[in-house]
Curated annotation (Swiss-Prot):
InterPro entries: Dihydro-acid_dehy_C, DihydroxyA_deHydtase, DiOHA_6PGluconate_deHydtase_CS, ILV_EDD_C, ILV_EDD_N, IlvD/EDD_N
Enzymatic class: lyase
Residues where [2Fe-2S] cluster binds: C122, C195
Cofactor: [2Fe-2S] cluster; Mg(2+)
Pfam families: ILV_EDD_C, ILVD_EDD_N
Keywords, ordered alphabetically: 2Fe-2S, Amino-acid biosynthesis, Branched-chain amino acid biosynthesis, Iron, Iron-sulfur, Lyase, Magnesium, Metal-binding
Role summary: Functions in the biosynthesis of branched-chain amino acids. Catalyzes the dehydration of (2R,3R)-2,3-dihydroxy-3-methylpentanoate (2,3-dihydroxy-3-methylvalerate) into 2-oxo-3-methylpentanoate (2-oxo-3-methylvalerate) and of (2R)-2,3-dihydroxy-3-methylbutanoate (2,3-dihydroxyisovalerate) into 2-oxo-3-methylbutanoate (2-oxoisovalerate), the penultimate precursor to L-isoleucine and L-valine, respectively.
Protein name: Dihydroxy-acid dehydratase
Length: 616
């Protein structure tokens, strides 16, 4: 029988000093012996997805205390990728994931907490907390801040839905007037919450549902809606029960590694492919799997990507649907229901509700449930009122979207395509693989061949695109932007956005060892592994080289014979200490980022730290 971790600091005469300090935080004799639950918050005024979280930690804590636990809250950092994007700030985004994971470990282990409620939302915060949860392997429930309402404005006598990416495209398009650009900017992000499309934040919050670590509705219920409050209340109550089941009943089934096992990781990836999630999710799932010692690799992702259809199309792949529309159609459970009916899911998995997948679908799938309260929850809709307040409105859709033929979520029979929304490509340009979000690729670009235009920084590529040096048919190659080479594996949303604004979104390809925002669409191929800084072939590409991309056949190739490629590799190695570094790039890199780069692995390993360099 495991004993409460917190007993280390609350029991025994030798812990008198620790108890004295606990008393100074408000604990009493009656609290020593109760489970101490860490409320891992991520409130910050820098990030719209987190600006409303200040009071939500207290909300969870009150429920923990009322349910027989002791709540202790702390905060992690949170970087806003959209604000950090397009300048040196983006170098810090991915490394912040490791800092978040480490900070959670540090706080929880230093104070011997027994369990956690993780209040996350945006791009690197959910992955960082997920990595920490699987590393620590103590009971945990995730509850995120929720998605933002989609922006809306009237253009050309039509009301259209908007998001952050629309503001970026309009701002870079010289054909758009200043007045229209400002109108879109002011309308694109109307409320608190994670950006309204199927970008990285929302993708990851959906995947925590599929992993079994969060409650139904977590990924899609709007941040502003009053119904979302119940998720926080339930999390506070339920985590105490999970802690007691483990520590008092020796029930290991409630531990995150037993919930988020190999089968659950496969289900999460199947969901990701079906909903055309952000390519960043691949990076984060691989990293989380390593923390949980789950044998889940790029090989598994490649296998699944060939089996799963594309069942849910959401911005940025279409302007028609945003997360509020996914929720109306049944949210994550609605997509999982269609995948289950297609025979694609592992059914022998459990979740923090204590339910199996079939039990969860029966209770929460809008196509199956008879529970009016569940149907009411999925009818929660937007209010269209600018606000930074959580739970501030109670608007509802007139009806649910249960049209599986032409609605937001489709059945397998009526899938957007029988090929899923993500694919892994292999070839001499990416021997360990690279990732493309096929959900955002125009059908006419699935097979593409063109000359390379090579840039050794995102900044140089942006200047070339906006300067008219990139033309239709080109393959833009941006290298030395991987985890080690950047360092920090910047997102390339600005280059892809500017290709669109210059009218090249469907006539050019972009390949990088960096990564893409969840807001990216078009023929954008990232995570090329090995990266340039690790000796990857992408470092050897020269201007004018022909690159061949064949998504249906999952291949990507530098059209160059082996002898020529070997000659280039030898020439690069001959550079000595300068080998596998940019030839002509000026970039100031801080000590903190250099420390990150010294241990970083390529994207096919999740860009985690290389434990072998630490002797572990």
């Amino acid at each position: 029988m495991p004993k409460y971790r917190s007993a280390t600091t609350t029991h025994g005469r030798n812990m008198a000093g620790a108890r004295a300090l606990w008393r100074a935080t408000g604990m009493t004799d009656n609290d020593f012996g109760k489970p101490i639950i860490a409320v891992v918050n991520s409130f910050t005024q820098f990030v719209p997805g987190h600006v409303h979280l200040r009071d939500l930690g207290k909300l969870v804590a009150e429920q923990i205390e009322a349910s027989g636990g002791v709540a202790k809250e702390f905060n992690t950092i949170a970087v806003d990728d959209g604000i950090a994007m397009g300048h040196g700030g983006m170098l810090y985004s991915l490394p912040s994931r490791e800092l978040i994971a480490d900070s959670v470990e540090y706080m929880v282990n230093a104070h011997c907490a027994d369990a956690m409620v993780c209040i996350s939302n945006c791009d690197k915060i959910t992955p960082g907390m997920l990595m920490a949860s699987l590393r620590l392997n103590i009971p945990v429930i995730f509850v995120s801040g929720g998605p933002m309402e989609a922006g809306k404005t009237k253009l050309s006598d039509q009301i259209i839905k908007l998001d952050l990416v629309d503001a970026m495209i309009q701002g870079a398009d010289p054909k758009v007037s200043d007045e229209q650009s400002e109108q879109v900017e002011r309308s694109a992000c109307p409320t608190c919450g994670s950006c309204s499309g199927m970008f990285t934040a929302n993708s990851m919050n959906c995947l925590t549902e599929a992993l079994g670590l969060s409650q139904p509705g977590n990924g899609s219920l709007l941040a502003t809606h009053a119904d979302r409050k119940q998720l926080f209340l339930n999390a506070g109550k339920r985590i105490v029960g999970l802690a007691k089941r483990y520590y008092e009943q020796d029930d290991e089934s409630v531990l995150p590694r037993n919930i988020a096992n190999k089968a659950a990781f496969e289900n999460a990836m199947i969901l990701d492919i079906a909903m055309g999630g952000s390519t960043n999710t691949v990076l984060h799932l691989l990293a989380a799997a390593q923390e949980g010692e789950v044998d889940f690799t790029m090989t598994d992702i490649d296998r699944l990507s060939r089996q799963v259809p594309h069942l849910c199309k959401v911005a940025p792949s279409t302007q028609k649907y945003h997360m509020e529309d996914v929720h109306r159609a049944g949210g994550v459970i609605g997509i999982l229901g269609e995948l289950d009916r297609a025979g694609l899911l592992n059914r022998e998995v459990n979740n923090v509700l204590g339910k199996t997948l079939p039990e969860t679908l029966e209770a929460y799938d809008v196509m199956l449930t008879q529970d009016d309260s569940v149907k009411s929850m999925y009818s929660a809709g937007p209010a269209g009122i600018r606000t930074t307040q959580a739970f501030s409105q109670d608007c509802r859709w007139d009806s649910l979207d249960t049209d599986r033929q032409e609605g937001c979520i489709r059945s397998r029979e009526f899938a957007y395509s029988q090929d899923g929304g993500l694919a892994v490509l292999y070839g001499n340009l990416a021997e360990n693989g690279c990732i493309v979000k096929t959900a955002g690729v125009d059908e006419g670009s699935l097979v593409f061949r063109g000359p390379a235009k090579v840039y050794e920084s995102q900044d140089d590529a942006v200047d070339a695109i906006l300067g008219g040096k990139v033309v239709a048919g080109d393959v833009v190659v941006i290298r030395y932007e991987g985890p080690k080479g950047g360092p920090g594996m910047q997102e390339m949303l600005y280059p892809t956005t500017y290709l669109k604004s210059m009218g090249l979104g469907k006539s050019c390809a972009l390949i990088t060892d960096g990564r893409f925002s969840g807001g990216t669409s078009g023929l954008s191929i990232g995570h090329a592994s090995p990266e340039a800084a690790s000796g990857g072939t992408i470092a050897l590409v020269q201007d004018g080289d022909i690159i061949a991309i064949d998504i249906p056949n999952r291949s990507i190739a530098l059209v160059l014979d082996d002898n020529a490629l070997a000659s280039r590799r030898a020439a690069e190695e001959a550079r000595g200490d300068q080998a596998w570094t940019p030839h002509n790039r000026e970039r100031q890199v801080s000590f903190a980022l250099r420390a990150y780069a010294s241990l970083a692995t390529s994207a096919d390993k999740g860009a985690v730290r290389d434990k072998s360099k630490l002797g572990g």
